[in-house]
């Protein structure tokens, strides 16, 4: 029985002040299924005036939302999680169609993890406490955390549903109001989600602006109505977001690019490690900021592991992403596919060996943006394919001899987002983990991203941490109330 793929409205507007509007000019953009090129739906191309209206709505809503209790906000977050659970199959299919990732991934990861994040922040916000310190016999210091205000959030195209949850859940929990902007490549799942939860929130608490990043997204960066910016995307754009926030003298949270090292020692758990190497680079077609795109293999097991990994790559079922048995779907758009193929050519020009893959898939999948899982023997960690973020199912394999050598190579990168160590020697795992200059190190696993474990980067991979209660601090500001109980004059004047 064919699966019904008609799961979107024909057109989507903007969510401003609790109402759906076509925007000030009513111009529309189209979203396409990257697996076959079919148009999925149209959505509004917002103007500067639309962003202004959304910010004003958020500012007005903040006056009352900030006064809600943590219990009230926690109850709403749990209700949002209930909506996700009740519509899990719908959201999974919508994310798959709009993004191109396999439905087995959206069912197992994107959607349930989104629900998990709302429940997590509903829980931890109830435990947040201020402090009171008796400084001396007469002076008392009270420290409170208050919501920072209106936050502008910009989310990427690789995990639009999950990244929305990563941004929205802690901001709402902290008592902030939101103007959120998805990528123009993948706006539909957030719009559908907003439709389902709009009735749970007071007007203006959550506002959704869609359109071109170069237009409405750029305007958001410089808007004086925001008290904080939060961005997930490339390091190149992240720099501009950070500069814009600095010019406004407001804080920013930036989750940016990566070129993560997936390190395999001779004593690795072989079969599990083989799967971990695949999960590190093939999950979401390699379009993951923390993808394990640099695979370092110790010399004693190098040939055996590379040969086995190449065979596993060849067996991957690349197919229509909505089919249950598909293991790898399509890239998000033609531009991303072109970038991947460009880097394969760069690798060849540098003298790297293409072990397997490296070509666009034609035939039955020729209408979509499909590429073969690709394994490249880089020879040197200095090769461009080993240093620059490709953002696709392309991994470089590099041989190493010693622990010290691989640590040096792993850290020889401008990025520092993720990484992994595979070994049955726990002391080695801890030594190497401590030595890696990266915000997340997995040990004998990869791409596990539950709420409760902080995620974020070192170096040019970002500023701040998400998926953890410490994110509440990023959406709040500290107030100190200093009380003197002394009744007499101090005698200073």
Predicted stretch roles:
Residues 1-34:
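Hydrophobic face of amphipathic alpha-helices that form TPR/SEL1-like repeat modules
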Residues 36-42, 263, 317, 349, ...:
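Conserved C-terminal structural/oligomerization subdomain of aldehyde/semialdehyde dehydrogenase
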Residues 37, 73, 95, 118, ...:
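Residue-level signal for inorganic ion chemistry
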Residues 39-46, 60-67, 153, 262-265, ...:
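Short, well-ordered beta-strand elements within core beta-sheets of diverse protein domains
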Residues 62, 66, 81-88, 92, ...:
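Structural signal for hydrophobic packing residues in well-ordered secondary-structure cores
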Residues 129-272, 400:
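Rossmann-like NAD(P) dinucleotide-binding subdomain of oxidoreductase/dehydrogenase enzymes
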Residues 236-380, 443, 490-492:
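ALDH superfamily catalytic-core signature
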């Amino acid at each position: 029985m064919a699966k019904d793929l008609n799961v979107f409205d024909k057109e989507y507007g903007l969510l401003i002040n609790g109402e759906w509007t076509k925007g000030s000019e009513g111009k529309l953009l189209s979203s396409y299924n990257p697996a076959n090129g079919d148009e999925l739906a149209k959505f509004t191309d917002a103007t500067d005036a639309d962003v202004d209206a959304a910010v004003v709505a958020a500012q007005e809503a903040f006056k009352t939302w900030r006064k809600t209790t943590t219990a009230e906000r926690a109850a709403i977050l749990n209700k949002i999680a209930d909506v996700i659970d009740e519509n899990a199959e719908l959201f999974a299919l919508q994310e798959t169609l709009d993004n191109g990732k396999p439905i087995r991934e959206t069912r197992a990861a994107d959607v349930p993890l989104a629900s998990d994040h709302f429940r997590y922040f509903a829980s931890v916000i109830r435990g947040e406490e201020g402090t009171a310190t008796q400084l001396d016999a007469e002076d008392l210091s009270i420290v409170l955390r208050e919501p920072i205000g209106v936050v502008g959030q910009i989310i990427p195209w690789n995990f639009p549903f999950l990244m929305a949850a990563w941004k929205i859940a802690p901001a709402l929990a902290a008592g902030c109001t939101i103007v959120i902007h998805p990528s123009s490549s993948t706006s539909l799942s957030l719009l559908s989600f907003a439709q389902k939860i709009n009735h749970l929130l007071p007007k203006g608490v959550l506002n959704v602006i869609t359109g071109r990043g170069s237009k409405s997204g750029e305007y958001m960066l410089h808007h004086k109505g925001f008290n904080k910016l939060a961005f997930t995307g490339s390091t190149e754009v992240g720099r501009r977001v950070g500069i814009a926030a600095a010019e406004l003298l407001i804080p920013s949270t930036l989750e940016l690019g990566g070129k993560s090292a997936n390190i395999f020692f001779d004593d690795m758990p072989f079969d599990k490690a083989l799967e971990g190497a695949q999960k590190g680079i093939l999950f979401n077609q390699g379009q993951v900021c923390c993808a394990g795109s640099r695979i370092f293999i110790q010399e004693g097991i190098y040939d055996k592991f590379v040969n086995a990994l190449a065979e596993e790559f060849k067996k991957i079922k690349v197919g229509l992403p909505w089919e249950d048995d598909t293991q790898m779907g399509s890239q998000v758009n033609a531009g991303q596919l072109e970038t991947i193929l460009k880097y394969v050519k760069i690798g060849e020009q540098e003298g790297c060996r293409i072990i397997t893959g490296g070509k666009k898939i034609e035939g039955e999948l020729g209408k979509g943006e499909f590429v073969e899982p690709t394994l490249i023997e880089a020879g040197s960690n200095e090769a461009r394919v080993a240093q620059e973020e490709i953002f696709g199912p392309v991994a470089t394999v590099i041989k190493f001899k010693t622990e010290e050598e691989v640590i040096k190579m792993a850290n020889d990168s401008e990025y520092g987002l993720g990484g992994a160590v595979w070994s049955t020697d726990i002391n080695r795992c801890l030594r190497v983990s401590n030595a890696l200059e990266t915000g997340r190190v997995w040990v004998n696993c990869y791409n596990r991203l539950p709420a409760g474990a902080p995620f974020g980067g070192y170096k040019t991979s970002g500023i701040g941490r998400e998926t953890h209660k410490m994110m509440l601090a990023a959406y709040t500001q500290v107030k100190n109330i200093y009380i003197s109980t002394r009744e007499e004059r101090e005698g200073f004047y």
